[in-house]
């Protein structure tokens, strides 16, 4: 599952304590990271060393995993607010499970590096086709302080194409200071009747700096069927255990189309 890649990115970025906010019928996420002694014994007995190693790596990531529930889907802002006691007054990172990122340096680590220099909240953005801006929160940039780091005039949640302030869309990585929780506590429902994180960040930007980091790596959106299939193929083509067979299959399939 994609949550595996999210946790691995967090670990590679130096994060040790991870809170996963789940919803109804999401127990499979918790089960995924639980140890399974019976399965491991069976794999060992049947000589499936490769699968045994993979199973053990999943459950022994070297990070501390915690879980909390969002009983009702009330928006991303509501989900983030449920992490308030866990964050305990520290800067923190939000990683959305629908977005997988690939780059030489993990995107989360890039945001942490920015924070080390600015000590300010930083949002990951990426240039998208203008016709697609209405799918995202979008920033209005206000000059840059580094090649990939912009000041932000304001944030707009899913603007109409003709009213979008830029083509720089917010993607699923945020580094925020804990002041965001005071804002979320009083945030009124926005688009769709939900508590929008983008609205809260826009409010925070009026009293303290919020920067936007332009991501130049690869982003995979697994939040829809087409994106999930494309991501599976892309990852399959780079994984040593599947790439050769998958390339062969795609070539054979291409000849039939």
Model-derived segments and their meaning:
Residues 12, 34, 85-88, 113-120, ...:
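Generic secondary-structure signature for well-ordered alpha-helical cores
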Residues 91, 141, 146-151, 165-257:
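Conserved alpha/beta core of the MobA/IspD/sugar-nucleotide pyrophosphorylase nucleotidyltransferase superfamily
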Residues 20, 94, 123-124, 212:
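Structural beta-sheet core signal
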Residues 1-94, 103:
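Conserved N-terminal catalytic core of the sugar/cofactor nucleotidyltransferase
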Residues 5, 9, 28, 78, ...:
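Alpha-helical scaffold segments in soluble metabolic enzymes
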Residues 101-182, 187, 191:
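Conserved core of the sugar-phosphate nucleotidyltransferase
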């Amino acid at each position: 599952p994609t949550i595996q890649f999210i946790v691995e990115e967090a670990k590679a970025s130096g994060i040790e304590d991870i809170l996963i906010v789940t919803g109804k019928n999401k127990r499979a996420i918790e089960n995924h990271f639980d140890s399974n002694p019976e399965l491991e014994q069976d794999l060992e007995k049947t000589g499936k060393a490769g699968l045994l190693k993979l199973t053990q790596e999943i459950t022994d990531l070297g990070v501390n995993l915690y879980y909390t529930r969002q009983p009702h889907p009330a928006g991303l802002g509501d989900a983030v607010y449920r992490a308030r006691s866990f964050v305990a007054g520290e800067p923190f990172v939000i990683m959305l499970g629908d977005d997988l990122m690939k780059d030489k340096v993990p995107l989360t680590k890039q945001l942490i590096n920015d924070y080390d220099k600015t000590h300010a909240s930083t949002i990951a953005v990426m240039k998208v086709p203008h016709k697609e801006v209405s799918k995202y929160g979008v920033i209005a940039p206000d000059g840059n302080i580094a090649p990939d780091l912009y000041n932000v005039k304001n944030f707009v949640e899913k603007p109409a194409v003709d009213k979008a302030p830029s083509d720089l869309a917010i993607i699923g990585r945020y580094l925020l200071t804990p002041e965001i929780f005071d804002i979320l506590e009083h945030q009124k429902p926005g688009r769709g009747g939900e508590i929008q994180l983008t609205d809260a960040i826009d409010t925070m930007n009026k009293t303290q700096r919020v920067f936007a980091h332009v991501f130049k790596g690869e982003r995979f959106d697994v939040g829809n069927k087409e994106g999930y299939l494309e991501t599976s193929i892309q990852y399959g083509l780079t994984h040593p255990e599947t790439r050769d067979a998958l390339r062969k299959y795609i070539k054979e399939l291409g000849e039939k189309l």
